[in-house]
């Protein structure tokens, strides 16, 4: 379980090999307004740990959080990485190209990332931007890395819709920040996969 978390730093979107981590890391990715910051806050049980911008795509920062977990009375540290949302409408084309290139370098060369959490709005499960993101991650995924699909805002679905979604995406997790649905399951998967306890 996650017992504490703290903000470490914010970085402009670019790869810097000097900014390495001693901890295994979890990267949260998804399109703008999918609920990345809210999910991090819910998992860490802190309302304002990760702050979301009122204007999607306005912030070009990668935010790092040090998270302390406990498993069988033993404590471990991992980092959560809150990445800028994909698919911003209010960013110039040139800035978007630079942004995407820098994110590309960061994701490919950040070897401490062990788990990519791809957040998808449960009401819009087959958007082209999400299909492309999934394909993109698979192209450079290393043997020690995994992708986990997490469907957000599941409080908007009825039971049959949830069952249908879970049946289609069998290894995914459905969550709701509003009623805390699925958060315990997600927390367990994050800890086990990031620290290698699932092997």
From Swiss-Prot:
GTP binds at residues 30-37, 57-61, 82-85, 152-155, 175-177. It comes from the Bacteria. Pfam families: MMR_HSR1. Signal peptide: none annotated. Keywords: Cell cycle, Cell division, GTP-binding, Magnesium, Metal-binding, Nucleotide-binding, Septation. GO terms for cellular component: cytosol. Mg(2+) binds at residues 37, 59. Its cofactor is Mg(2+). Necessary for normal cell division and for the maintenance of normal septation. HAMAP family: GTPase_EngB (MF_00321). Belongs to the TRAFAC class TrmE-Era-EngA-EngB-Septin-like GTPase superfamily. EngB GTPase family. This is Probable GTP-binding protein EngB. It comes from Campylobacter jejuni subsp. doylei (strain ATCC BAA-1458 / RM4099 / 269.97). The gene is engB.
